[in-house]
Amino acid sequence: MQDANLLNTSQAAQALGVSVDQVRRMINAGQIRSIQTHERSPHLIPTAEILRNTPIKPRSSRMSFDEYCELDGLNASLIKRLNKSLNHYLAAPLEQSASMAKGVAIHDSIELRLAGKSFAEKYVVAPNVDRRTKAGKEEYDKFVATETRTILKEEDYNDVILMTESIFKHPEFWRIVPDAEVEQVITWQENGIRAKARLDYSCEPIQTVVDLKSAQDASPYGFKKAITRYSYDIQANWYRRAYQSVTGHYPEFLFLVVENSEPYNCAVYKLSEELLHSAELKINNSLELYKAYLNGEIYSKGYHEDIMELS
């Protein structure tokens, strides 16, 4: 059975949009690396070689989140998984959690308010019924069937309103966000690998990218713990790379952090050069792991096979 990461010359030709003879010439010229199990066996081309020979120009665009998800390429979330292990990368994607849905609502709330619109135009509070009862379930199902707006729990709805109020009171928000491009999608190549990112706010006149985060604790101590737990350093570096691919320069990267419960404090942070450099190494290692996987060179997909001493 042929390895899914290896293509025959016909498949490679189709992927590259050239003839089979052209693929053979590229192999003979050393432009494409191929694998043979023995001298007379057919050439098999690693998927990584196809990606390397189908370059894409860095570009910026606007699209829906669903359209962005359909784009081929590694994003910050996948890089974070690769940084843990190949098995984490290969695992099934996480489903959207309630906290993620709340995060989307905050973004929408900001955009609606900047446009002079009400949050209620797009979101509505779920009816206060006991869905454990037949009558309550029927009433809720009827509400869902006729409601076109996004439904939130009452506490989440109120949290989003108060979080937005807090964000709008922060001076850094008004310095950057009103003139920024919102949810800019960037596609580019990293060392021959297709890459993508979706930036919350990017303001080219002041060369700044802002990522909005909700957190339980927006204090310096609390958010530093979140950076470690959620690998936000990798995200910051990845977004800086994305921005540089289309503008030619690296931006200042800021996290706009707002607490998701009272008192809804808001704070802005940037990462030290040491943290960004550490993330650079993590990303480079993750990309090398990914390329080795595409080339069929990975035999262990976990952490390590030897005994490791911890201290």
Regions inferred by a protein language model and the residue ranges of each:
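Polyanion-binding surface elements
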Residues: 1-22
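Short helix-start
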Residues: 6-10, 33-55
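DNA major-groove recognition helix of helix-turn-helix
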Residues: 27
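Glycine-centered, phosphate/nucleic-acid-interacting loop/turn motifs that mediate DNA/RNA or nucleotide
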Residues: 30
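Metal-dependent nuclease catalytic cores that hydrolyze phosphodiester bonds in DNA/RNA
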Residues: 56-196, 303-308
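Conserved catalytic cores of phosphodiester-cleaving nucleases, focusing on short active-site segments
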Residues: 197-223
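Short helix/strand-bridging catalytic loops that position acidic/His residues to coordinate divalent metals
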Residues: 218-230, 272
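Metal-dependent nuclease catalytic regions and adjoining charged, substrate-binding loops involved
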Residues: 230-233, 238-311
